[in-house]
Amino acid sequence: MPADIMEKNSSSPVAATPASVNTTPDKPKTASEHRKSSKPIMEKRRRARINESLSQLKTLILDALKKDSSRHSKLEKADILEMTVKHLRNLQRAQMTAALSTDPSVLGKYRAGFSECMNEVTRFLSTCEGVNTEVRTRLLGHLANCMTQINAMTYPGQPHPALQAPPPPPPGPGGPQHAPFAPPPPLVPIPGGAAPPPGGAPCKLGSPAGEAAKVFGGFQVVPAPDGQFAFLIPNGAFAHSGPVIPVYTSNSGTSVGPNAVSPSSGPSLTADSMWRPWRN
C-alpha cells in the first residue's frame, strides 16, 4: 500500500514541476526603499570625507601656527576647529589693518556695507511670520552689538574716537590762530557809546524801528533803552566751521580784542584784508 502511493505521487505531473516556475519576479524598489538601503553606505562615505578633511586641516593649521605636529598628534576634532577659527580671525584682522593703511576709505565702506546688511536682516525679520520672537530678539541684539564694535573701530595709529580731541579749525588768511571756543549767544551786549566794527557801512531800514536798528558788516546793531548797544548775530554766521573772533569795545569807542594791540604795533587791516567768518 505505501508503495502504490509513492508511485502515484512520483508520477504526478504537478510534483515533477520545479518550484521556481511558480514564483513571480521581484518588484523594483521604490526611491524611499533605495535610500534606506543605501543610507549606511552614504553615512560611511560622509564620515570618511569629514575625517580626511579634518586630517588635512590639522596639518595646515599646525604648519600655519608653527607648532610641532608630534606634540599635537592626538588633537580632538573640536580643538582643530577652534584653532582654525582663531587663526582665520587673526588673518581677517591683519588684512583689515593692511587695507586701512593703504586706503582709509575701506573702513567707511565696510561700515556702510554692514549697516546695509543689518537693515536688510531687520526688514526681513519684521516681515517674516515664521521666526520665533526670542530668536529674532537675540539676532537683532547680536547685530546691534557688532555694529557698535564696528563703529568703535579706528584707523591704525589713530586714537579712540572718544579720546580724540576735535582738530582746531584752520585760521583765516592772514589772521592769527585762535583756540576754538563755543560760539557766543546771538545777542551780545556792548557798552554805550561803542562804535560799530570797521569794514561795513551802515544800512538803514525802511521802518521806524529800522532807523534805530542798523546793520554793520552783516551784524545788526540794536540800541537798548539803557543807552547800550547789542549786536544781533544772524544764524548764518555760525553755519561755517571757522572760529568766531569776539570783538569788544572800550569806552573810547575803539574796537579791541581780548589782547589789545596798539595801532603802531603792526599794519592796520583794511576792509578787504580783514577776515570775516560769515564771508567764507
Curated annotation (Swiss-Prot):
Location of the bHLH domain: 34-91
Superkingdom to which the source organism belongs: Eukaryota
Record's keyword terms, sorted: DNA-binding, Nucleus, Repressor, Transcription, Transcription regulation
Biased composition annotated in UniProt, kind: Polar residues: 254-271
Bias-annotated ranges (Basic and acidic residues): 26-35
Family matches, as PROSITE patterns: BHLH, ORANGE
Localization, UniProt: Nucleus
Motif interval(s): WRPW motif: 275-278
Domain Orange: 110-143
Main localization of the protein described in the UniProt heading: nucleus
Pfam families named among the record's database cross-references: Hairy_orange, HLH
GO biological process, one term: negative regulation of forebrain neuron differentiation
Region span, Disordered: 1-44, 157-200, 254-280
Biased composition range(s): Pro residues: 164-174, 181-200
General function of this protein: Transcriptional repressor of genes that require a bHLH protein for their transcription. May act as a negative regulator of myogenesis by inhibiting the functions of MYOD1 and ASH1. Binds DNA on N-box motifs: 5'-CACNAG-3' with high affinity and on E-box motifs: 5'-CANNTG-3' with low affinity. May play a role in a functional FA core complex response to DNA cross-link damage, being required for the stability and nuclear localization of FA core complex proteins, as well as for FANCD2 monoubiquitination in response to DNA damage.
Subunit architecture: Transcription repression requires formation of a complex with a corepressor protein of the Groucho/TLE family. Interacts with SIRT1. Interacts (via WPRW motif) with TLE1, and more weakly with TLE2. Interacts with HES6. Interacts with an FA complex, composed of FANCA, FANCF, FANCG and FANCL, but not of FANCC, nor FANCE.
PANTHER family found in the cross-reference section: BASIC HELIX-LOOP-HELIX TRANSCRIPTION FACTOR, HES-RELATED (PTHR10985)
Name this polypeptide is given: Transcription factor HES-1
Species name: Bos taurus
